[in-house]
């Protein structure tokens, strides 16, 4: 879960109530990324290919939701939100 700890550090400056919303979503994204990597490494079966597609779509939905929330937060916590947006954009 090194990736989760990395993402978690980017939102550390945000208020606790916002972190409480984002942390479960970030955990889900990291889990989806790990599964995506497993399926990328072995996409030999139709099941793996279907799972890969489903998790990729889930990841994109989560990223869109987080970005929307962070754009709304930018007015108050510009630097932390900008940093997380930049990191999330690397994985699109």
Predicted region positions:
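Contiguous, low-complexity intrinsically disordered segments that are highly enriched
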Residues: 45, 49-92
């Amino acid at each position: 879960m090194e990736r989760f700890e990395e993402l978690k550090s980017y939102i550390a400056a945000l208020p606790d109530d916002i972190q409480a919303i984002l942390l479960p979503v970030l955990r889900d994204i990291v889990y989806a990324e790990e599964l995506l990597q497993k399926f990328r490494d072995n996409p030999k079966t139709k099941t793996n290919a279907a799972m890969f597609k489903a998790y990729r779509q889930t990841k994109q939905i989560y990223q869109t939701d987080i970005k929307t929330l962070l754009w709304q937060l930018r007015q108050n916590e510009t630097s932390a939100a900008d940093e997380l947006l930049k990191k999330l954009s690397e994985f699109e």
